Amino acid sequence: HVDSSAASDVYKRQVMSCSRVGMEEIGRGIDTELDETRDPEGRVLHTKHNGMHCVNIYLPNGSSRDQRQAYKDQWIEDLMEWAEMFVGSEEPAILCGDLNIAHTEDDIWDPKGNKRSSGFLEHEREWFTRLLDRGWHDLLRIHIGPQKGPYTWWSNFRRARERDRGWRIDYVLANDVARSMMKSAEVMREGGMVVSDHAPVIVDFDI
């Protein structure tokens, strides 16, 4: 356990990665020609579990000001370039976490009202489509098929969670090898309700 006050100059948050089959930490952050700062905010953790690469991501939120949106826009391009090493790998690999983008109109309760909102901007959604076109698979959407939702994040205001007015911004994306190992995928809507405004995405793999 880390006291959040000790990290007040960075983030008052902690991240945990657990495994029943053993775990090897490969690296933290991304390193590309575009991002010489190597992810100074510590938004990526790359671990390996019984042969499967697991890249945990907390993608920047651009809603606070234009400068942060510009940082987010650069960051997602860096991420796409960096993740190329995994997408064609013969080893299973997943990108997972809070990507802060609702990809399609099915992934947000009010698409018309949020067209100018960070996380649902046209260029962000186009980036997500390009990411999938490179060979990544959205496992939850593949498993449940086309439908409205399910959502993984709700605002703390206006009883959004109770009324299910949410966004799907948390994902598990897989390369071809990892996709072939998927058994099931779901959102635990009530999961984490006490401690978070997000719900966990659970994917079961046969590894």
Model-found features: residue ranges?
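Single conserved hydrophobic/aromatic residue that forms the stacking wall/gate
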Residues: 1-7, 11
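Short hydrophobic/aromatic beta-strand or adjacent loop that forms the aromatic wall/cage
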Residues: 13-15, 41-46, 168-170, 197-202
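Beta-strand-turn-beta hairpins that frame and shape the catalytic cleft
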Residues: 41-58
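Metal-dependent phosphoesterases centered on the DNase I-like endonuclease/exonuclease/phosphatase
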Residues: 75-169
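Surface polyanion/phosphate-binding segment centered on an Asp-His-Pro turn
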Residues: 185-207
